[in-house]
Every structure is written in C-alpha cells, then in structure tokens.
C-alpha cells in the first residue's frame, strides 16, 4: 500500500471516527489500522562494508548514570579530507557495529537498549535532537522518523497481516528496517564544510537524553555520503555512549566455592549501586578480613581503571569453611563473599552461564564483550554465547556462514585453558517445538544445522543429524507458552529406541530470566513479558495473561523426567538486553540464573565431562553449594541398587528456608526429606531402605531471600 495523501487521510480519519461512533469500536480500530498504517516493504539489508578512515567522531559525555538524570549528549563529527560539498549527507546511527572481520563491519540495531525515543517535535521534552552547523553560512536539514520503534513495529504488524491476506512480499530481516528508521540524517543543503569542520548532533538538547534503567553500551556510528549520490560509507571512527551504575552501595566479593587446602586462588571485588549495577564511581583502598579456613592480604586498591572491580590473591588455610569480608574505608560500603569450602574434593565447582546472546542475533553487545564481561567483570569460570540459528520475528532466515564462523571463532579466541573456559554453541530456535542450545565437544568441528532447513526441522531430526558427533543438546524454558497459544514442548526421543542421538540430551535449563519450568504452580513462573520495561511489560502481561504452559501440557521439566528423559538440572540467564550482570536487571521481572559444573580443571575437556555426566547444579543467581550422593554416586549418576543412601550438603549465601529431597516413582513426585530454617548450611543423611521399583531423586533449595537452586537427578534402577 502506497503513501496516503493528506486529503485522503483526513477522509479516512473521519470514516474511522464515524465507524467508532456508529458501528463497532473494534471494527473502527481495525479499519484505521488497515488504512492509516503503511505496510513495511523496504528493508534493504544493512551493508557489510569495509570502514573508511575519513572523519572523526567524539562523544561528550561518554557515560550517563543508568536510571539517573537526563543530560545532553553531544556527538561531534569532524569532517575529513576533501570536505563535504553541498548535497552531502552525514547519518548518525545509534546501534551496535558488528565486526564480522577486520574489513567487514555492519551496523546492527539494539533491541531494547533503553535510551528512549529520539524526537524532533518538542525541544522542552527529553531526547530532543538538534543538529548544529559550524557557521551561519551552512544550512543543514535534519530528518528522522518520530517514534521510530513504535511506528516500525506497527508497519511490521501491517506487513504480517497483509501476508496473511495473501499479499506476496519478499522476505526481509526486520532489524534492517528498524535500523534504517532509527538513523538521523543531516543533509547539507546550503554551503560546504571544509576539512576539520565540526557538525554537532545534540541528543537531548535542552532537557537531556534519558538514560536507560540498566547498564548498556551503544555505538554512535556515522555514515557519510560525501558526494550526495546516495552511496554511504561507514566511518571507522566510532562514538560510544555508556549507561553505568550509580553511587556505590555494596561490595560483592566473589571467590571460588571449592578449593583444596593450602591452595591459592583469585578473588574479585565488584562495587555495585543500590540496584546491583556495576559502579565505576569507587576508587581507593579496600580493607580485607577473613573468617574460617581462608587468609590473605589485609587490603587491595581499587583503581579508577578497574571501573568498579579489583582482584587480589587469597589462600586456603586448612580444611573447613571460610568467608572473606571487604570494606571501603570512608565510603560506608562493604560485602562478604560466597562460602568457600576448603577440602580435598578432587574437583572444582566452576560457575558460569551457558546461555547468553550477542548482537549477532538479538542481543545488544558483540560476542567478545560478553566473554570479557564473564571473565573479568563477573568472575565466572566459563560461559557460552549461544546465538539463535535464525532471526525470526515472523520471517525466518538462517544465520549466514560469515555469522556462524564469527560465533565459533569468538569462542575459540577467548578460551584460555587453566583460566577461563568457553563453549562453541548456537541456539536451535524452533518456536513451535521448543528452543534448545547445541554445544560441540572440545575436539568436535562445529556444524550449523538450523531448524529452517527441512533436514533439521524437528528435535528428532536435529538429534539424528548430530548422531556420531561429540555434541550436546540442552532444552530450555520448555514451559513457555507462545503468544499465539499453547505450545507442547517436544523433548524429542527419550532413548535410542525412539530415535538416534537421544543420549545427546544430557541437561535441561530448568530456570532462566524467563522464569521457572520445574512444574506447574512452581515459584517464579515463566513470564516472557517480564523482560519488557515498565508500563509496556505491565500492559503486555495484562493482555497475554499467563505465559506459562498449562498443567496438562507435558511441557514442564518434571513431565520430561517422568516420561523417561534423563536430564540434569541447570540454570542460565538467556540474557539478551543487559550489558551488565545478567543476574540482575532493574527492568526485568526475574534474575538470571547460573550453573555450577563439578569439574576437575578449567578446561573444555573437564567442563564437558562434568556436563555429560550431569555433575551440575543450577541456581537463580547465588553461588550456593548444592551437592549430594546416592550410594556414593555423585548427582547425575545412573546406578543399580535395592536401597538408596542419600548424603550431601547445601551451603547457601543466606539462610536456607527449605531444602528438600524430591523422589519420583510410579506414585509420582513427593518430598521424602525436608529441612530448613536452621541457618545457611544443611547436611543431608537419609536412607530409602527397600526400593520396590526404579526411581530418581533430586534436590531443590529455597533460600530466605527467595533465591532457588536445584541439583540432580540421580537415577536408581532396582536390581532384579
């Protein structure tokens, strides 16, 4: 549908009002939508291009406080050699530049970066855009789409409706259309600009640019059409604006959970604000004290370059439990570490997240940043960036070969054996049969098997195609009910009799930022709209109602386990938006989860073995120790016996409200042992003396602060 003229638009508005008053209000809304909203048709791909070193981009200030006061942000683009003639164009592109290679850059839009709507209508409101020429002799015209995100979303919905009605529209990636509509175009209509002349884009002129609620890093790239021919070049000089944490409120002290007696280890101190966001505002001496079986230096310096982080070396001083306290003298902030257990376990508990997303798919940051964040800013032992196999939004297109190669290369580049582990992975994102991450073992060459290819379009077909490879498939948020209606999650074949590759499904993500999929009625139920900010999220939740599957859907983790799937319980973040701690985001309903791997070392081989053997635990964020044995076999094992002796322990980061051992057999699920309310540590010692049938056990934990954890199951086959 083409552009509607002003007079016709007036007539259509009158008709819509008439229909609203006389006929049927919903019909009037549909009529107005069909006639007044333009169909999105032009979504030419953002070019992958070699950047040019021509001008220079500078941003002032370079950071605002997340959730703080709006301030004007000036992006100054200095014209390069040869100048800019009349008709030339400079486009400011707020988003993220993806470096597919040194000479292959592409501007990508950031979904939900939180900076708010840029506008040109009202200088008295936040986010007003003004473009300033260097002199009165130079006239610059400015064009941009008002409410670009909202209007493009409506245009996209109109596109979907027209396709449903039979209109043939060429497939497109919606990000391209969104990115094109978000750009600010400054055209030189009178005069010329010499080399060195500045053009200023003022974001929030007057009332300031409203910062997002959470931490984010956004590129302010410039595209230049020097001749006015419509041929744009991406300048290699990038501006950048950061939203950072506010005033220091708490020190987070992150130490290993399991260490050997007399072992030396590294400790991370993070300064966070009252909402848990990393704060760069603290610098100076930090005083350190020790409790129990740990010791080390009495102080450490947090430098300005540390941007709210400081590392120091400590050590175990024998067997037992220890904690580390850190305080900032004169600043009134302090913190205590997670519990440190000093014992000869023969393995470590590696903490990290197997489920994050980058700008390659629908995240907000480049893959390399996410690896840096995990290792240097969060103190994790491992991570995986599991970008989607497609960009869907109604028009699915598989990742390109160049994108997939970047994903795998980034994982390899950031793997440091003995220090930090990365996994090569991607997400198989089938909205009808369920999402799952595909991980490749240490010696396995990755293969890309998108669900858009008919050969890999079902969970069974995916597993069959992976058969014979060292790979693992991890289902996640199975209880997520799609907005279009109920979805029965397809867990795929349970064993080899049902299909090839069934044994590759070793783990299931019981919890993420989307919520909890343990069982119907569980705490923290699935709420995808919980990831949306403020009023928008509240509205979506009100319209959609419950977003989790029904009690008879078969989509919960307990359903899968009861049906014969042998899956260890883990947790992740499924982080898409925040550049900060995925366990915390002020705009989102739930914290992101993390997974502990009981592994022998910081290597891919050891981490892979721990996952394959299901020696794992998952939490909603804290570093709890959750560990148990059945007849001496570690959680995740499969054993044969006529009785079960269950031993173990849980050490929380706060008091433990409930620790329960859950058993399943033909009678269903039930808690056979419970304890809680006695402090941060619980010891498990329980016996099932006479087993009449095969069963399995797992642990579930609830802390006093509401955080949760899981470990297991362990399966017991009754000896005949």
Model regions and ranges:
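Short, solvent-exposed loop/linker segments at the N-terminal edge
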Residues: 63-70, 83-84, 257-263, 637-642
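Extended, charged catalytic domains and RNA/DNA-binding interfaces, predominantly
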Residues: 250, 260-303, 307-720
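Exposed regions on extracellular, virion, or secretory-pathway luminal proteins
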Residues: 9-12, 17, 149-150, 195, ...
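Hydrophobic residues in beta-strands and at strand termini
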Residues: 79, 94, 188, 203, ...
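Ser/Thr/Pro/Gly-rich, low-complexity intrinsically disordered stalk/linker tracts of secreted
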Residues: 31-250
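N-terminal Sec-pathway targeting helices
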Residues: 3-26
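Short amphipathic alpha-helical segments that mediate assembly, nucleic-acid/protein binding
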Residues: 8-10, 154, 263
